[in-house]
Design a protein with these regions (language model features):
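N-terminal secretory signal peptides and thylakoid transit peptides that target proteins
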Residues: 22-40
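Conserved alpha/beta-hydrolase
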Residues: 136-152
Length: 387
């Protein structure tokens, strides 16, 4: 067991399995998972039943951004952290909106920093902001951002996702952090949540500036959109979906704007438990936010196209020799994504299984999210000096 991980069974019922002790399992139960065609999988995911120096801000002409001045998060503001709204541009000229969290009384020291994003279809006012603020309480500069085309970020049309552009969004956040006078650019890490766990791994594989990465309750969005849950989609079903999505492009071109799917995360009865869990987070006061695609919108119908054609996990072995930590709930329907990623990644790597936790528990359950272990991982990986 690595020295930075707590020994024994930590508080909150978290069970830890190190890379040596963890036994990879591929025969996961399929009970309660969605079955059927790739189109059904796309519907389930793209329309899931849905005193420091001033930081540098960059804007673009691609989208008129309006940042709310109010605290409109789904979590309480911490008295231990300073918060400010910032913007920066990615390599494609899209302006991204973000929340920057800084530990109070930093004494002018250059600090280690973290870029945080996710879940897929969420905004920075939800889970990623909670992670960022909590890690700032532990001494890190942390930035939580809205991906391109969503939330307060720029980009048209709205509510589009892209494996390439979203991977670039992560690196753009690293650009931003590395330009801040209070950040040590040689000590930057990344945290990805849910679908952004897979995107974070893809980004860190190519962006060698990042020194360590955590993927919490990760999805591989390219895999699930292409193959369905538990890889249940046949080649024939995949081809049929691609025909439908390709023809949708003609309709969108004729109309001059993209078609959107139905509202996300609405329940009709009889859904699998993980879909109920999504609803209970995104559609209730617990996690609802009006700017989140998963709470109050839907993706463009053609969003799955690029994910079906561009696998995200191809190069994750190239994260090494930088350390990787995967965190997943014991009872999460999505656990097999992390197991496959763990098998594909090279050392140094570790895998934490959180006892009794579901996929959505790791969005906001403070008694389940292992922040002590996450901070210890980054403390070691980024060689952060003690205060």
């Amino acid at each position: 067991m690595p020295q930075w991980l707590p020994r024994g069974k930590p508080s909150g019922g978290q069970a830890i399995q190190s890379s040596k002790a963890f036994r990879m399992t591929t025969a996961l139960t399929r009970k309660h998972f969605l079955q059927g065609s790739a189109a059904a999988m796309a519907a389930a995911l793209v329309n899931p039943q849905a005193a420091l120096a001033q930081p540098i801000a960059a804007t673009t002409r691609s989208h008129a951004m309006s940042l709310t001045p109010n605290w409109d998060k789904t979590f309480a503001k911490s008295a231990k952290v300073d918060h400010r709204k910032v913007t920066f541009s990615n390599r494609y000229g899209i302006s991204l909106a973000a929340d920057l969290y800084l530990p109070k009384n930093a004494s002018g020291r250059k600090l280690a920093a973290l870029a945080v994003c996710g879940p897929f279809g969420a905004v920075k006012e939800q889970s990623s902001g909670l992670y960022a603020q909590t890690l700032a309480e532990r001494g890190y500069v942390a930035v939580a951002f809205d991906p391109s085309f969503t939330g307060e970020s720029g980009g048209e049309p709205r509510n589009v996702a892209s494996p390439d552009i979203n991977t670039e969004d992560v690196s753009a956040a690293v650009d931003f952090l590395g330009l801040q006078p209070f950040v040590d650019r040689e000590r930057i890490g990344v945290v990805g949540i849910c679908g952004w766990g897979g995107i974070a791994l893809n980004a860190v594989a190519v962006d060698k500036r990042v020194k360590a990465v955590v993927a919490s309750t990760m999805y591989d969005m390219s895999r699930v959109m292409s193959k369905g849950y538990n890889d249940s989609v046949t080649a024939e079903q995949r081809a049929q979906t691609l025909v439908q999505l390709s023809r949708q492009r003609w309709l969108d071109a004729e109309n001059g704007s993209p078609a959107y799917g139905p509202p996300l995360n609405e329940l009709k009865g009889g859904e699998a438990q993980f879909l109920v869990d999504y609803h209970d987070y995104y559609k209730t006061p617990r996690g609802f936010h009006p700017r989140a695609v998963n709470s109050n919108g839907s993706w463009t119908v053609t969003t799955p196209l690029s994910f079906m054609n561009m696998p995200l996990m191809t190069h994750i072995a190239e994260i090494a020799p930088r350390p990787l930590l995967l965190i997943h709930g014991e009872k999460a329907h999505s656990r097999y994504f992390a197991e496959t990623a763990f098998a594909a990644a090279a050392q140094p790597k570790d895998f934490m299984i959180i006892e009794g936790a579901s996929h959505v528990d790791l969005y906001d359950r403070m008694d389940k999210i292992p922040f002590d272990a996450i901070a210890a991982f980054f403390d070691k990986s980024l060689n952060r000096p003690l205060p």
